[in-house]
């Protein structure tokens, strides 16, 4: 099989498996949350989103830098005699991955205790006094530790590009967690809590809802650990122990000293860790801001906004970003002009796809989203500003998605010094973001709309920085290529400009004659307009689509 097509096939399969896993798990999550939202108030969504932020922050700071650093781990197959396994990787490389998998737990244990204790002491007494709240906090902490225990298994499957196994286990974990959450809330409402103003206890309802959320997180973590453990021990039973789950010293066949961790990977981990800390604070900084500048009800509204507004981001863009990061890290680990051209082609095609999709989101999202979602949310949310704010959030999604692939590229190829420099830039962006939040939320009193505008400006700065890095990266490595060759691979901006102009005209006419959609007839008109625009895009990019389909068919 052609090397180029083999890489493309792995990338395409990775995107497919991750996307299917995300679609299944998030689809179940979306369905059950849609049913739950009628039982829960904005205040409950606010506190659960805060707990979700705590959990994701501890997990991110504990494991994300290790996940990225181990993609660059050096295989010992490059020198000396090899002790091969079926997948083409030697046992020493896999054992090194297992060893690195223990670092997240070592970081996460003290970090979780410190962060949760600190935030618990600052919580409103109303939430602390809720029934089962202390038990919920303990379950959240326990779920963090259990999920970190499964990290060594995850690193092995990530390195071997076993997307199917990872997506399958993650889908099971999310599905079981959502079902457990849903069963507890609905069972309590139907069987325990009374009906009517005299019998129904909103205070207990809020307590049990938070407890159900915590149980769901625990079920998710336990499912992941059980699945990965079963996979490991079943392989041990059928093929013998290829590597040990225990922390094991690695003894190379050369005269080098034995080690637990590869030194180059450790050094890269140290440099990337602080850069990722700033990235996470910028990415999740909106949650920190709303915790300090917004009411609990507004926090709940923003949580629901993130769930519904970024659904396409989590279903489509997140799998592409992850697969791209893994694909580039493995592809560019070997210095080759052919690999450089392939990576550039993939990045350009993805960028064009994102830009076209952004046109549809910007034109049809704001005017249709409120009408579609009003059937989903219950009466508790109809009186809030949710339906108005979702229109503004639609403009944020394209920036969020485009930044995702640009930063995925940066993380895959940047050197330690470039990552260190990026950390200082992220510090500057953090300051600008905080100032914009104060300006739009406090000074102009724009509330959640101000937060969304601040996020858009933040993402624009990050896109500009990574875009400049990508340009310099390829310009430096491909500077010996002829101008004609370089120009031939650049995106056809004129085609996109023509489509964007027609899309803008369609959007203007749609807004002038219809405006915000209020009935099924207007919704149907918008669907027809979107289909016409889609046909135009396919026609204009028919050569690119044919090329991609031909490459996929050949690789298969």
From Swiss-Prot:
Gene name in the database record: RFT1
Record's protein name: Man(5)GlcNAc(2)-PP-dolichol translocation protein RFT1
Keyword Lipid biosynthesis in record: no
GO cellular component: endoplasmic reticulum membrane
Major location (coarse): endoplasmic reticulum
Protein's membrane topology: Multi-pass membrane protein
Keyword Magnesium listed: no
Pathway annotation: Protein modification; protein glycosylation
Family in the record: Belongs to the RFT1 family.
UniProt keyword list: Endoplasmic reticulum, Membrane, Sugar transport, Transmembrane, Transmembrane helix, Transport
Cellular compartment(s): Endoplasmic reticulum membrane
Residues that span the membrane, as ranges: 11-31, 41-61, 97-117, 136-156, 172-192, 207-227, 300-320, 353-373, 394-414, 424-444, 450-470, 499-519, 525-545
Task performed by this protein: Intramembrane glycolipid transporter that operates in the biosynthetic pathway of dolichol-linked oligosaccharides, the glycan precursors employed in protein asparagine (N)-glycosylation. The sequential addition of sugars to dolichol pyrophosphate produces dolichol-linked oligosaccharides containing fourteen sugars, including two GlcNAcs, nine mannoses and three glucoses. Once assembled, the oligosaccharide is transferred from the lipid to nascent proteins by oligosaccharyltransferases.
